Amino acid sequence: MLDTKYLRNELEFTKERLAARGFALDIDHLKALEEKRKSLQVATEELQASRNAISKSIGQAKSRGEDVAPIMAQVGNLGTELEAKKIELAALLEEINAIAMSVPNLPDESVPVGKDESENVEIRRWGEPRSFDFAVKDHVDLGETLGGLDFKSAVKITGSRFIVMKGQIARMHRALAQFMLDLHTIEHGYTEAYVPLLVNTDSLLGTGQLPKFSEDLFNLKPATEEGQALSLIPTAEVPVTNLVRDTILDEADLPIKITAHTACFRSEAGSYGKDTRGLIRQHQFDKVEMVQIVKPENSMDALEQMVGHAENVLKKLGLPYRTVVLCTGDMGFGAAKTYDIEVWLPAQNTYREISSCSNVKDFQARRMQARYRSKEDNKPALVHTLNGSGLAVGRTLVAILENYQNADGTVTVPEALRPYMGGIEQLG
């Protein structure tokens, strides 16, 4: 959620920055609402002052033996009018807040301007894609040959875009998550968290999934015994970031760095016909998430650090990748700046996204009222939040199967994973 000063006092600047990401801000409507708000605010305050002043005169009139009935009637009328104005003002503020909740974050000035993913900017590559002297198989063929990817059973049990993993491939999937968690906690300084896979509406509002992305969620019915509606998490970013909702932290507590391995659930609304084969786009998938809570002046450095942490996973696994900075037109709703890391997939002969790391600045913190108390002035100020995939486990499995495949259909286990696989050097 943007600072309301941008929607009140800096409308032209805000409109220009949002236009760069393809969002049209109706500033005429906002100006009209703001004028109405000011008018109602003044009217409410004047009515309150008049009512208070006249109420005080009742006692004086009584002491003089005067009939106070007319004054009482006047106070009653003012009270009725005041209540009506308060209701009108509350409804207007709710309308303004709803608009504010639907406005995306302002892109950082360092973000390249562009209309869509074709204008994202590659900033570096690592590793050389392997040259094969045999026909390359995709992960679906490899997984089915190895007896480890069972799409038919998943369709029977649940439906499309789900998977049953078995044997060595299931073990590698588990090993990858453990490897990533160990790397982030031991080498990168994160604290591991185990979090709920179900979250309430306040949590989804806090991180920006609601109200805009309600169609992407799997919602549970009926509500809980507390009467709360719950949804399956689309990413661990939601429960982990909400750990600091409605909290005032000490400056000494920052930065907070948390990692969590969870299943994630997405309806993939709008993705009909995309990546229908294999593990690339599933309704349920595992991901190791990284979240940082930092002071505002440190958030851009923290973003670069987080990208490096995600890249380090791929380096240790020996998987070629490239890193791109997203242009204004391709960024997510809450992001001020985003880097995507794309891993090389030989069967597709291209790079595919395996991690997205974003600096959200104070966009989520304002929604969540996540603050810290500065040592300098002891006043609460909004933190900055960052999130990133470290990595998507299923897509990492896909990359290993395809990049480490052999001519006989076996798959070499990357050296970094072997301690997590009981020393196994090869699948198949």
Curated annotation (Swiss-Prot):
<keyword id="KW-0963">Cytoplasm</keyword>
<keyword id="KW-0030">Aminoacyl-tRNA synthetase</keyword>
<dbReference type="Pfam" id="PF00587">
    <property type="entry name" value="tRNA-synt_2b"/>
</dbReference>
<feature type="binding site">
    <location>
        <position position="389"/>
    </location>
    <ligand>
        <name>L-serine</name>
    </ligand>
</feature>
<keyword id="KW-0547">Nucleotide-binding</keyword>
<dbReference type="InterPro" id="IPR015866">
    <property type="entry name" value="Ser-tRNA-synth_1_N"/>
</dbReference>
<dbReference type="InterPro" id="IPR006195">
    <property type="entry name" value="aa-tRNA-synth_II"/>
</dbReference>
<comment type="similarity">
    <text>Belongs to the class-II aminoacyl-tRNA synthetase family. Type-1 seryl-tRNA synthetase subfamily.</text>
</comment>
<dbReference type="InterPro" id="IPR042103">
    <property type="entry name" value="SerRS_1_N_sf"/>
</dbReference>
<dbReference type="InterPro" id="IPR045864">
    <property type="entry name" value="aa-tRNA-synth_II/BPL/LPL"/>
</dbReference>
<dbReference type="InterPro" id="IPR002314">
    <property type="entry name" value="aa-tRNA-synt_IIb"/>
</dbReference>
<dbReference type="GO" id="GO:0016260">
    <property type="term" value="P:selenocysteine biosynthetic process"/>
</dbReference>
<dbReference type="Pfam" id="PF02403">
    <property type="entry name" value="Seryl_tRNA_N"/>
</dbReference>
<dbReference type="InterPro" id="IPR002317">
    <property type="entry name" value="Ser-tRNA-ligase_type_1"/>
</dbReference>
<feature type="binding site">
    <location>
        <begin position="266"/>
        <end position="268"/>
    </location>
    <ligand>
        <name>ATP</name>
    </ligand>
</feature>
<dbReference type="GO" id="GO:0006434">
    <property type="term" value="P:seryl-tRNA aminoacylation"/>
</dbReference>
<comment type="function">
    <text>Catalyzes the attachment of serine to tRNA(Ser). Is also able to aminoacylate tRNA(Sec) with serine, to form the misacylated tRNA L-seryl-tRNA(Sec), which will be further converted into selenocysteinyl-tRNA(Sec).</text>
</comment>
<comment type="pathway">
    <text>Aminoacyl-tRNA biosynthesis; selenocysteinyl-tRNA(Sec) biosynthesis; L-seryl-tRNA(Sec) from L-serine and tRNA(Sec): step 1/1.</text>
</comment>
<dbReference type="InterPro" id="IPR033729">
    <property type="entry name" value="SerRS_core"/>
</dbReference>
<keyword id="KW-0436">Ligase</keyword>
<dbReference type="GO" id="GO:0005737">
    <property type="term" value="C:cytoplasm"/>
</dbReference>
<keyword id="KW-0648">Protein biosynthesis</keyword>
<feature type="binding site">
    <location>
        <position position="289"/>
    </location>
    <ligand>
        <name>L-serine</name>
    </ligand>
</feature>
<keyword id="KW-0067">ATP-binding</keyword>
<feature type="binding site">
    <location>
        <begin position="235"/>
        <end position="237"/>
    </location>
    <ligand>
        <name>L-serine</name>
    </ligand>
</feature>
<comment type="subunit">
    <text>Homodimer. The tRNA molecule binds across the dimer.</text>
</comment>
<protein>
    <recommendedName>
        <fullName>Serine--tRNA ligase</fullName>
        <ecNumber>6.1.1.11</ecNumber>
    </recommendedName>
</protein>
<feature type="binding site">
    <location>
        <begin position="353"/>
        <end position="356"/>
    </location>
    <ligand>
        <name>ATP</name>
    </ligand>
</feature>
<dbReference type="GO" id="GO:0005524">
    <property type="term" value="F:ATP binding"/>
</dbReference>
<dbReference type="InterPro" id="IPR010978">
    <property type="entry name" value="tRNA-bd_arm"/>
</dbReference>
<dbReference type="GO" id="GO:0004828">
    <property type="term" value="F:serine-tRNA ligase activity"/>
</dbReference>
